Amino acid sequence: MASQSSNHYRVYIKNLSYSTSEKDLEELFGKFEPVNVLIPSYTIHFSRSGRHRPLGIAYAEFRTPEQIESVVKEFDGHVLKNRKITVKKHMAYDPNNRRFSFKRKSNIKNGKMNQGGSSTGEILAPVAKEFLVRDDETVSIGQQKKNPPRKPELSMDTIMIQKVHGKVTDESLKDFFKEYNPSQIYIFKSKKPKLNPMNLTGSHVNVLVKLDVTQTKLDEIISNLRSQKMNGRYISMKPAYKSKVLEVEKAIAESKSLENTGEGENMIVDEKASPTNKHGKNAEHDNSEISLIGTVSNC
């Protein structure tokens, strides 16, 4: 490895395939006669064989700044082993500057390395920082960046109340929301997680309440009621997800269908469970994500 004092110039390559070797890069940059090529790697933890894995980046050194200009121009965006690689001038990391940014070019001209110290050390020092900052930009050819998950759509007229004490009734809910003319009240229960079947806080249910929002918006209703207690307890309210309202309405429709066949009496609705009748049998072989608890009230 040549020393820093030899005035060599370096490029940084990222988004490399793990199967790319230093020889592959030497051949790729062959006509520009690279002085040296390095693909940093790390040891896989808990590997008995002491296996190494590359970081997906590399460094290549050339003799003149004109060479690195030509290399960047010709190979930035080049496809190598089904990956579109990025090639750019290397900018040395300064550990004494905590606010160091890869976009700053102070004290660095045309990718030239700083004087002093060995070239090997200069190459290895910035590996960790550049890898951590840039790793999320690795994209294979033909692979599209995933769109961020869309936020669930909120209902404009229905409030969700989670983990209400199990003794709550539709009458107490009607009284609590009486100023906003509740038209539908759905009470349903979440299934207890299998990993933690013990319940030391008592029985809880969830509630959906459809309100009249022609005069007052739902967020304002929630704000107005937040300081009030129901059955001596504060409750947590928020706009319901439309998807949850649809699940409950679907479960209700199924329960009404069963009532017409004489099997829908005393319908119980648990989330993640199928509706059951009073005999404990599955009311319908359906994978509905919500099953009804007790009370469905048309106010």
UniProtKB/Swiss-Prot annotation:
Lineage: Eukaryota, Fungi, Dikarya, Ascomycota, Saccharomycotina
Organism: Candida dubliniensis (strain CD36 / ATCC MYA-646 / CBS 7987 / NCPF 3949 / NRRL Y-17841)
Region (Disordered): 262-299
Function, as annotated: May be involved in the modulation of rDNA transcription.
One function term, GO molecular function aspect: mRNA binding
Family label: Belongs to the RRT5 family.
CDD domains: RRM1_RRT5 (cd12409), RRM2_RRT5 (cd12410)
UniProt cross-references to PANTHER family, sorted A to Z: REGULATOR OF RDNA TRANSCRIPTION PROTEIN 5, RNA RECOGNITION MOTIF RRM DOMAIN CONTAINING PROTEIN
Gene for this chain: RRT5
Keyword field: RNA-binding, Transcription, Transcription regulation
Record domain RRM: where: 9-92
A Gene Ontology term for the protein's cellular component: nucleus
One Pfam family named in its UniProt record: RRM_1
Record's protein name: Regulator of rDNA transcription protein 5
Cystine crosslinks: none
